[in-house]
Amino acid sequence: MKIRNIHERTIAATPEQIASLLADFDGIWPTRLAPSPRAQSERLYKTSMMLWQEYDRPGAARAFRVLSPAELQGEHWFELERVPAGTVIRHTVQGEALGDYEAIWRDRIEPAHDIILEAVFDNIETALARIWKGDEAKR
């Protein structure tokens, strides 16, 4: 089964501001929903169900390949696009679920992913608001 899942939101910030937050998942991950991806080694991250390898993808702020499970083959990445209202942050998952993972993706992973990604976007907006509030206090 082919997988394609896209989330996007326009945030009133620069791509650089958002990229700095994306660089550290611990600061933006909704840990009340799921543990944040844990670094296993350089550019290798473990989640509760998957192992990701970070790689350089042209145009992406961060990009990952799914290394395991073998039945879930794909990539996911964050893109940042400057627009008049700020920046569009886009997260794309593209790949294929094989065998039992067709049902696991559809019934468990994708619904959880959707909730987690929207919460990540919420947390980015909250973190930016805190930064701006701190900047205001310094003036």
Regions from the PLM with identified roles:
Residues 67-122, 126, 131-136:
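Beta-strand/loop substructures that line and gate deep hydrophobic ligand-binding cavities in soluble
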Residues 4-6, 47-51, 72-77:
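Short, surface-exposed coil-to-beta transition loops
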Residues 40-47, 62-69:
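Short beta-strand segments that buttress and anchor functional surface loops
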Residues 35-38, 50-57, 80:
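Short, exposed beta-strand/loop patches in secreted or surface proteins that constitute
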Residues 1-41:
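Hydrophobic ligand-binding cavity/cleft-lining segments
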Residues 18-29, 53, 62-64, 89-91, ...:
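Hydrophobic pocket/interface hotspot
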Residues 12-16, 55-59, 79-90:
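A short, structured loop/turn motif at beta-sheet edges
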